[in-house]
Regions:
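Conserved, structured C-terminal
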Residues: 1-23, 27-31, 105-371
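Acidic active-site catalytic centers that drive phospho-/nucleotidyl reactions
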Residues: 50, 100, 195
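Short, glycine/charge-rich beta-strand/loop segments that flank catalytic centers
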Residues: 81-94, 138-145, 174
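Acidic, proline/glycine-enriched N-terminal capping motif
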Residues: 1-90, 96, 220-221
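Short beta-strand and beta-hairpin "edge-sheet" elements
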Residues: 98-101, 352
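Short coil/turn segments at secondary-structure boundaries
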Residues: 93, 98, 113-117
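Conserved short loop/turn motifs at secondary-structure junctions
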Residues: 53-60, 89-91, 108-110, 141-147
Length: 371
């Protein structure tokens, strides 16, 4: 199957990007300065991420659509304000996660941002669940870029006046070169920032303006280290069809009203796990010393019994040390619990810790993922 390219592919090439294949797309993993420098630049300035491989699903409908979506997602969509966004999940009957997503309420319906590897399957699942009653468009004519970091608001505001007025997890339509684009104040780096949905034919020009104003292109490598420092889940690592939001320590993302009344797909198992406790739970892990524990590293208790597994691990440039997330048996999930990590046949000491590893907020409400 032919590898797809985003509308910014030539710009990536011109900026000497190193590419990898991801979810069927040729995507920039890093540029010439390298992942660590790109990571640090985003934390101190403003980084531009091409995330056009992700799905932008527009579903058009009225109050009936809202009612039908509440049977699917564990959200209080009836009371979601216009242009407000929520983090949520598409789940199976056992509350395993098909995908984690961001859903935004628009005047004519909803915009749902889906993970690249999941978007086609998500579309099929939602089409079946909604029984084709509503117009659904998985829009490949629009690109998606994320502008992240403390200087992003000032840079973007030079191009889109009043974008600084947006609250965290809210959005609005703006006009650029005579065309409409949709901007939300959101992101997945632990920094203040924005995501911009813009037509494919304008995205390169728009991105060049951001670059001229001081932002830099950042690859997916730094996006991963940034999200891990922020303690954020990555689908296929911390989330999947065998893992529930409760096990992933994401109870906060389920509306309280829905927890009380249920009525959404997977609600029976969600409510049961809250009542009885999940057997395994996602935790932060801080290895002692400089050892990096990668995905699938086995986790042991001090008696050297296996109690879990690492799902993501890296060197955290902002904390200047190794960090990891993983799942452990509930009884070993308390902060400061001492554990062992098996790397290349040897066991090394580490500690369970809280999340995020790195905490910084520039806009009210931005630390929505803190555990």
């Amino acid at each position: 199957m032919e590898i797809k390219k985003t509308s910014l592919n030539k710009l990536h090439q011109d900026n000497k990007a190193k590419f990898v294949e991801f979810a069927g797309y040729e995507m920039p993993i890093q540029y010439s300065s390298g992942i660590i420098e790109e990571h640090k630049f985003t934390r101190s300035n403003s980084g531009i991420f091409d995330v056009s491989h992700m799905g932008q699903l527009f579903i058009y409908g009225d109050d009936n659509l809202t009612n039908d979506l509440e049977k699917i997602f564990p959200l209080d969509l009836k009371n979601l304000k216009l242009n407000s966004s929520k983090y949520s999940f598409l789940m199976n009957d056992k509350a395993g996660v098909y995908d984690d997503l961001i859903i935004t309420k628009l005047e004519e319906g909803f915009l749902i941002i889906l993970n690249a590897a999941c978007k086609d399957n998500d579309f099929k699942i939602l089409s079946n669940l909604l029984k084709d009653k509503y117009k659904m468009v998985l829009d490949d004519q629009r690109s998606l870029i994320a502008i992240q970091g403390p200087k992003s608001v000032e840079i973007l505001n030079l191009i889109l006046k009043t974008v600084a007025d947006l609250n965290f997890m809210s959005g609005n339509w703006f006009t650029y070169k005579g065309q409409k684009l949709y901007v939300t104040r959101s992101g997945y780096t632990g920094e203040d920032g924005f995501e911009v949905s813009i037509s494919n034919d304008l995205v390169e020009l728009f991105t060049k303006e951001l670059l001229e104003n001081g932002a830099k292109l950042i690859g997916l490598g730094a996006r991963d280290t940034l999200r891990l420092e922020a303690g954020l889940c990555l689908y296929g690592h911390e989330l999947g069809t065998e893992t529930t939001p409760i096990e992933a320590n994401l109870k906060w993302a389920i509306s309280k009203e829905r927890l009380n009344n249920g009525g959404f797909i997977g609600s029976k198992n969600i409510i049961s796990q809250i009542k009885d406790g999940a057997k395994k739970i996602r935790v932060g892990i801080k290895p002692e010393g400089r050892l990096i524990a990668r995905e699938k590293t086995k986790i042991y208790n001090e008696s050297e019994q296996i109690i879990g597994e690492v799902t993501s691990g890296t060197f955290g440039p902002s904390v200047n040390g190794p960090i990891a997330m993983g799942f452990v048996d509930q009884e070993f999930s308390k902060k400061e619990t001492k554990i062992l990590l098996e790397v290349r046949g040897k066991k090394y000491p580490a500690n369970i810790c809280g999340l995020p590893f790195y905490k910084k907020s520039y806009v009210k409400g931005a630390n929505w993922w803190v555990m």
